[in-house]
Structure formats: C-alpha cells, structure tokens
Curated annotation (Swiss-Prot):
Its main location: cytoplasm. It is found in: Cytoplasm. The keyword Magnesium does not apply. Forms a heterotetramer with UvrB during the search for lesions. Pfam families: UvrA_DNA-bind, UvrA_inter. Keywords: ATP-binding, Cytoplasm, DNA damage, DNA excision, DNA repair, DNA-binding, Excision nuclease, Metal-binding, Nucleotide-binding, Repeat, SOS response, Zinc, Zinc-finger. This is UvrABC system protein A.
C-alpha cells in the first residue's frame, strides 16, 4: 500500500471516516479534505459509489433530514443508515446523479432549471402585448399623445380624423345615420368610401359593414393643436374610446385607443401576470393540447400494420377473419363498394382505403351479421370507420389495459392550435424587444444568452427588468459552461440523455449559489466531448470556490489530474475491492506502484494504438442517405461493415439522432421486424449483408428486485435444469419450476420469493427485513434440501460470477455464459444480485455478455452508446477485447463514444459537427483515426492528433 493517510489537523478542514463497511467496503478509514475538489476513482465495482454515495452522501443527507420535524420527514426520502462506525465533519449533502430527470412530459429544460420562471416574470413585467389579428401593440394613449403623433407628420399633410363607430356588424343602419345627421355631422366613411350623410347608399342587410364618422379634416400645422385635441375628444366619444387619423393622400391609417386595447378591434387583456406564460397553468396553457405542445392521434400507418397483406389475412389488427364481428362489417363494405377482401391493402383504390379507415360519412350501407346461434340478421347504417372506432373506444373505456393497447396505434404531432408552443394565443402575442416567449425558448441557449445580454429596454422598464435579467443571463451562462449550449429551453426533459440531465442539475445547483454544502457527483463527464471537458472542470472548481466540498466519482484522466485530492479504490472489483489504495494528491497517486490508476497516470500502462487497421471492404458498405431528423442536415452516412466504427462529435452534434433515432430504428424495423418509427431519411442500402441488429444501451436490465444477472442472461434456466435432474429431485418429482422464486411451489410463500419483507414506517424510511421463514434464502426448506455438488440453489445464487465459473466448469451450457460475464469484467457481481443495484455501465456489460454468449452468424450489427460509462482505464482495455471478439466473427460494431482510448483503436471514424445544435448535424470527417486527425475543423481530430 502507498501512503494513504496524509494526516490532517483534525479541525474543521477534514471529513473523517472510520470503519466504513457499506456493500463491499472493507472497514475503510479515510480522511478527506473539505472544501476541495476530490475525485474518487478505481475499477468498476471497486466500491467508489459505495463510498461516495452510499456512505458519505447517505449519511450527510440522513443527518440533515433527521434534524427536521417528524411531520416534514414523512415527505422526504430517508436514506438507510450506512454501516460505518464514525463520520465527522460532514455538511448537508446534495447528490447529482446520472438518472435521467423526469418522465413528466410537462418538464422542459426551462422549467427544470427554473429559467422559465424568471422568463415568465420578465414577460409579465416588461412585455408588450399585441393584437393577434392586427399585429398592433395594445396600448392606451392620452389625447395629447394622439395630438403629438399627428403633429409629427410632415407639414401640410392632409389628415382626416375619424371615429370608428361600427365594426363588422350586419344591418342597414338607417336610424344610425339619421341620428348622426341630427347631431350635426356631415360625412361618414362606409366600407372605406366617404359619403355625405344625405347621400349614403342603401346598405345590404346581410353583409357586415364598417362605418366611421368623419369628425374633422385638417392640414398639419403647428397652430392646430387645440382644434386637433377637440376633434380627438369627439372621436373618442363616438368611436368607443378609439380614434383614427387617416392621411388623405396616401390612405395610411394611424389608430389610437384611450383604453388598453387594440385600436382596431378592441381586443384587450387583463393585467399581465406570470401565470399567463406558464403552460402548466390553465390560465396560460393552450386549451387544445393542455400545454403539452403535441396531440395524440391514431396514425393510419400504425393502424394498417401490414399493408402488404389483405384485409382478410390481417392488414389491420383485429379486423381480419379471426375477429368475426368486425370482419363481417368489412365483408359487407366489400359487397357494397365492390372490392375484394383478399386483395392486398396496398392495391386497393384510395377511395376504398378512405372509407375503411375514416367511415362512409352519410352513405348508408346494408350490413349482414351472423348471430351466435347461426342466424343472420340485416341492419342498415353508415359505417363508422376504423379510426373513429378506435377514437371512440379510447374515449369511452375505463380500462387502462385497453388504453395501453390502443396507444400502440397512436402517434404525436405538433398541436394544431399552438404549433407546439404550448401557450395560449394571448401569451404568444406578448413581445419583449420584438420576440415572443415561445420563440426565445426555442432558440439554442447561446442565442438566447446573447439576446438577453444585449437586451436594451427603455426608461423604467430597464429598472424593473434589471434583477430578472441578471438571474436569467447567469443561469444561461452556467448551462453553456457545462457544455449544453446546443439545447433550448423548450426541449422536453424526457428526451435528455443521462449525462445532459446531470449537467443541467449541476448548472441549477451553481445557479442556487449555496455554500458549505457537500456535493457528490457521478461521472459528470459522460456524454461530453474532450473539448467541453475544461469548461466542466472549471464549473466544478467554481462550485468548490463558493466554499463547498465537491466529491466526484470519475474516470476521466483530465479530471483526475486536475483534482485537489484523489481517492483510489481497489485493488480489484467486488469481493476483491473495497480498500483505499491511496488517498493523496494526483502527483503522488501517479507515483504509487500498487495503484492501477497511478500506473495509467504515469504512463507505465496504456491502451495501445493497434499496429495496423483492418482495411475497408468497399463491397460491404451500409449506406444511409438523406438523414434529416432533429438537426441533421440531409446527411449521407457510409458505414464499412465488419469493422469497429466510432461515431464522434461534440455534444448535440447529432450522433444520437443519426445512430439511435435513424440507423438503429431503420435496421430494427427491417431486420428485426420491430414496430419502430425512424427519423426522416431517404434511402438505405446494404442491409442484405446483415441479418439482425442489437442495440446495447445503458437502460436497466430490469426494474424489479426479482430481475438479476442470472435470469437476464438465461443462465438460471440451465442451472435450474441441473437441480431438477439431481436424483433426489427426480425421486420427489420436482420439475424446473420448483427452483424458480417467481412461481408458487418451490419459493418461500411468506416473502413470495423476495427474501425480504417490506415494513412501512410512516415517519421513517421503509425498512426491508429478512424474511423470518426462509431467512432471506427465497426458497422453502424442501427445495433447499436439494443439493448439487454440495450447494443448494440459494447458495448458488449467492456466488459471484468468478466462484460460479469454477463451480460449474464441467457444465458447458452454464460455464460458457459465465465465461462471457468474466470476459466483460463482471466477475465480481453475484448471480442473484438484484438488477436494481447494478450501475448503468454494469447493466450494459451484462447485455454485452448475453450477446457474446449467443451463437451468432457473424452478420450482426451491434450499436453501443457510450459503453465506457462507469469504466476505469483497465476496464476499457477489457471492453475493447470483447468488442474485438465480436468483430473477429465478422460482425459490425458502431459505437457512439467520446473516450479517446476507444476512438483511437477504432477502424473507422465518422465525426459529426462542427458544433452542437443548429451548428452541427453535418459529417465533417470520416476515415481511419489517422485520416481524421488531419482534418482541420474537426475537434475530435485535433485531440486525436496529440495521442496518435
């Protein structure tokens, strides 16, 4: 072991941990300096998260929550008390984790960061409302302001002052004209024509008319002030508080209103309030879509799932031969319109398709129905149409299951009323400096930031807005500093990746400006290009300089080198980890012999650049043409098959759109027969070289504690078969199901095979206690009496992969799968470990192992999205070996990645960019790493050049 306890003076400047035993920690004693940037690093599974999150954060949070009243505690999640003897020097803790924010469709980047709240305030206080119809500002003027406006016109301009008396009303208005004459007026303007009052033509009764009373005609001179003022006063009296000055030569009109309203149509608003601009408030949300910005509709393309089939054989699910009632309707339609139910849907005329999908309108059709007794009866009525039928069933059903089923046929589209702006009409026509709120929210953050930095308001508006603007620009600045300049405020929070969501939370934390807090972060560099790394580190240092302790679990080399203090966990993973190898400055860690991290930092170990690249075979290319989803600019992607291709580019350059939303979905639809809707593209060629696509992402392998690596990889089935074939099992007649903890029979019924029982404590966190009957073993006594090589099924589930590998080495079906788990570096996880306790990186590697263990044809396309998340240098070397094995069998691998160690070992690179958001979406460079390194304008190339 290297020097691992720099002795600090035990004052207020250290966090002292003594005897930490959470998860796999081996009684760890550790002193961490406070108010410093501390990086915790080590192999995947070495106990970093156990130390940072499950010990430090859990205890900091728990102590803070304990200080609150019992009433307040019930609303907060209480953390379990970590297994530790003593922790001193803790501050209240805030954790910023990888979990993608919310699945609430109402959450946007603006609402999560609270910038939207400040914008609402700004628009309510200094916004200028406009009339949606006439695009004129709503404003009220005094008579003297109206007079001044007319006097500003060039001298000698002939002006007519009018009172708009009737607007868009039907009638003959005979009495009205007589009344005006009696009051001494001489002229009126009717529908744009000026007449003497006694010469007005007879008006048509059923047409809407506009009538203005002519009050005065003047030439603009300085001495007509008094006369103008009197004319305007008269005009306002007769024109419903409105007046109109028309230049007689050019016909140009100047409208005035004495009320806060549109001078033309009197459209007016109550006083502007912040809630008018909230799409989560009925006052502000668009009434059509309730502020969601999109509406669901039944999509004909999804309803007709198999257009190549006939109606009889299942072009439309549920309306074919197997469903007698609905199919009788289709047959009756076919008789009425004379089409063939056996003909493929694609070949039917458009008119017939329209009737089948949308109904026959008013046309009555004779339907013949067959009752259950076998008698037929006839009815005549219009045909409802399949889509209206689905809409009606969706509206009327009370069953969530039916709704779920019907949702499969739905798609979203932008709301027809607000066009996706989410706000009601009144709010969409309030402008600040000529821009409405929903437009500003849709800009990339850099543009929004510039707009508010340079916003120039006049007079008292400037004073009102000053503080609000400071908050808005500061918060936008923080978002830009963590590399999110390409996002916009209206972007839905559920579409953000884990790394983006985490950095947004990081930015809002800096925005809140707390001091004296302990922040615990989980790999904030995920999804960040090398270029943005410096800005992220500057942000973390800024958090530290505010007076906070910043503890980061991180594998990124720059972060480790820039830290004030590094804690290296190890030496191995799982059972073999849980010790602190060294806790010291980065310089000293690099000198430490035992530390794998140190060896990579000092350059003793490194991931080698392959001596030669596999050449591209021009005959085996996958070509995707015209991809234009999100920000892609009509891109053509050429992927050499049978190689490892890295898709690179700064955050927001379009990598996920191109690969996950376009390529993965097209290939899944064409090769795996999946119901996927890819982003728009023109054409794809070269699919004949592939027979399936596998997308290995970081989503959890199961959301319930019952899901575990053994069940997920299919290991558990052969293990249960082994136990069922033991002589004692045969004797008792036990089958495979006896050894499952998910079905009745072999499992312990007291805890239903969970091994723990949840006890609800109202003011405290729910407590999970081991089941008293089976003592956490999940099975009943009879099942546990069956042993294979001296171990029962519960003991097998408790083995680590490594132990199980030795135990089952004589059983090829099991050992093959176990070996692949070993190969991806997961020897330390337990077979029965609950899926919910696996990190994203671990879940992804379990999936990789599952794919590796399958017999494959060598014609598979593997898609991996940032597989290095959660991986240490040494783990990355392992991962690259595994990917190399997949390639060795002839498969094609596409990796979205920022990690330079992976990028430099790829055969082919496709670099998107140059920037994120609108500034991205183009392919800047493609070729071998050496070729890309030479491309000017490619950020990836610039960093590759330094290491190749």
């Amino acid at each position: 072991m290297c020097n691992h306890h720099p002795k600090h003076s035990h004052g207020n400047d250290t966090i002292r941990i003594r005897g930490a035993r959470t998860h796999n920690l081996k009684n760890v004693d550790l002193d961490i300096p406070r108010h410093k940037l501390v990086v915790v690093t080590g192999l995947s599974g070495s106990g970093k998260s156990s130390l940072a999150f499950d010990t430090l954060y859990a205890e900091g949070q728990r102590r803070y929550v304990e200080s609150l009243s019992a009433y307040a505690r019930q609303f907060l999640q209480m953390m379990d008390k970590p297994d530790v003897d003593l922790i001193e020097g803790l501050s209240p803790a805030i954790s910023i984790e990888q979990k993608s924010t919310s699945h609430n469709p109402r959450s946007t980047v603006g609402t999560v960061t609270e910038i939207h709240d400040y914008l609402r305030l700004l628009y309510a206080r200094v916004g200028t409302p406009y009339c949606p119809e006439h695009k004129l500002p709503l404003s009220s003027q005094t008579v003297s302001q109206m007079v001044d406006a007319v006097l500003k016109l060039p001298e000698d301009t002939r002006v007519m002052i009018l009172a708009p008396a009737v607007r868009e009303r039907k009638g003959e208005f005979v009495d009205f004209f007589a009344d005006l004459q009696a009051q001494g007026f001489a002229r009126v303007r009717v529908d744009g024509e000026v007449y003497q009052l006694d010469e007005v033509p007879k008006l048509e009764k059923n047409i809407k008319h506009n009538i203005d009373v002519v009050i005065d005609r003047v030439k603009v001179k300085a001495d007509i002030k008094q006369r103008l003022a009197e004319s305007f006063e008269t005009a306002l009296r007769h024109g419903n508080e409105r007046a109109l000055a028309m230049e007689m030569d050019s016909g140009e009109e100047h409208w005035f209103s004495a009320r806060f309203a549109c001078p033309v149509c009197s459209y007016s608003l109550p006083e502007l309030e912040p809630r008018l601009f909230s799409f989560n408030n009925p006052m502000g949300s668009c009434p059509t879509c309730d502020g969601l910005g999109n509406t669901n509709f039944f999509d004909p393309e999804k309803v007709v799932a198999h257009p190549e089939l006939s109606l009889a054989s299942g072009a439309i699910d549920g309306w074919d031969k197997r469903n007698q009632f609905y199919f009788q309707m289709i047959q009756s339609l076919a008789r009425h319109y004379g089409f063939d139910v056996q003909a493929a849907w694609e070949t039917l005329p458009a008119k017939i398709k329209k009737v089948v999908l949308h109904g026959s309108g008013k046309e009555v059709i004779d339907f013949t129905y067959l009752s259950e007794r076998g008698t037929t009866f006839n009815r005549s009525h219009a045909f409802e149409g399949i889509i209206p039928n689905l809409e009606r069933r969706y509206r009327e059903t009370d069953s969530e299951t039916v709704r779920e089923k019907l949702r499969e046929y739905q798609n979203h589209r932008a709301c027809p009323s607000c066009g996706g702006a989410r706000l009601r009409k009144e709010a969409r026509y309030v402008y600040v400096s000529g821009e409405p709120l929903h437009e500003v929210s849709a800009w990339p953050l850099t543009k929004t930031h510039r707009f508010f930095e340079t916003l120039d308001l006049d007079g008292n508006k400037k004073q009102i807005a000053e503080k609000i603007l400071k908050e808005i620009t500061e918060r936008l600045g923080f978002l830009i500093n963590v590399g999110l300049d390409y996002l916009n405020l209206s972007r839905s929070a559920e579409t953000l990746s884990g790394g983006e969501a985490q950095r947004i939370r990081l930015a809002s934390q800096i925005g809140s400006g707390l001091t004296g807090v302990m922040y615990v972060l989980d790999e904030p560099s995920i999804g960040l290009h090398q270029r943005d790394n410096d800005r992220l580190l500057a942000t973390l240092k800024r958090l530290r300089d505010l007076g906070n302790s910043v503890i980061v679990v991180e594998h990124d080399e720059d972060a480790i080198r820039e830290a004030d203090f590094v804690v290296d966990m190890g030496p191995g993973a799982g059972e073999h980890g849980g010790n602190v190898l060294i806790a010291d400055t980065p310089e000293n860690v690099a000198k430490c012999e035992n530390s794998v991290t140190g060896q990579y930092l000092s350059g003793k170990k490194s991931i080698a650049v392959p001596s030669e690249r596999t050449p591209v075979n021009p005959g085996r290319m996958l070509v995707l043409k015209g991809a234009r989803g999100n920000n892609l600019k009509n891109v053509t992607l050429e992927l050499p098959l049978g190689l490892i291709t890295c898709i690179t580019g700064v955050s927001g350059s379009g990598k996920s759109t191109l690969i996950n939303d376009t390529l993965a979905k097209i290939t899944a639809r064409e090769l795996n027969r999946a119901q996927e809707e890819p982003a728009p593209y023109d054409d794809i060629r070269g699919l004949e070289h592939l027979d399936k696509v596998i997308n290995v992402d970081q989503s959890p392998i199961g959301r319930t504690p019952r899901s575990n690596p053994a069940t997920y990889t299919g290991l558990f089935t052969p293990i249960r078969e082994l136990f069922a074939s033991v002589p004692l099992s045969r004797e008792r007649g036990y089958n495979v199901g006896r050894f499952s903890f998910n079905v009745k029979g072999g499992r312990c019924e007291a805890c239903q095979g969970d091994g723990v029982i949840k006890v609800e404590m109202h003011f405290l966190p729910d407590v999970y206690v081991p089941c008293e009957v089976c003592h956490g073993k999940r099975y009943n006594r009879e099942t546990l009496e069956i042993q294979y090589k001296g171990k029962n099924i519960s003991q097998v589930l408790d083995m680590t992969v490594e132990e199980a590998c030795e135990f089952f080495d004589a059983v090829p079906t099991v050992s093959r799968k176990l070996q692949t788990l070993m190969d991806v570096g997961l020897g330390y996880i337990r077979l029965g470990q609950s899926a919910t306790t696996l990190s994203g990186g671990e879940a992804q590697r379990v999936k990789l192992a599952l794919e590796l263990s399958k017999r494959d044809t060598g014609r598979t396309l593997y898609i991996l999205d940032e597989p290095t998340t959660g991986l240490h240098f040494a783990d990355i070397a392992l991962l690259l070996e595994v990917i190399g094995r997949l390639k060795g069998k002839g498969n094609s691998i596409v990796i979205i990645e920022h990690n330079l160690d992976v990028i430099k070992t790829a055969d082919w690179i496709v670099d998107l960019g140059p920037e994120g958001g609108d500034g991205g979406g183009r392919i800047i460079a493609s070729g071998s790493p050496e070729e890309v390194a030479k491309v000017k304008g490619s950020y990836t190339g610039k960093y590759l050049k330094n290491i190749l």
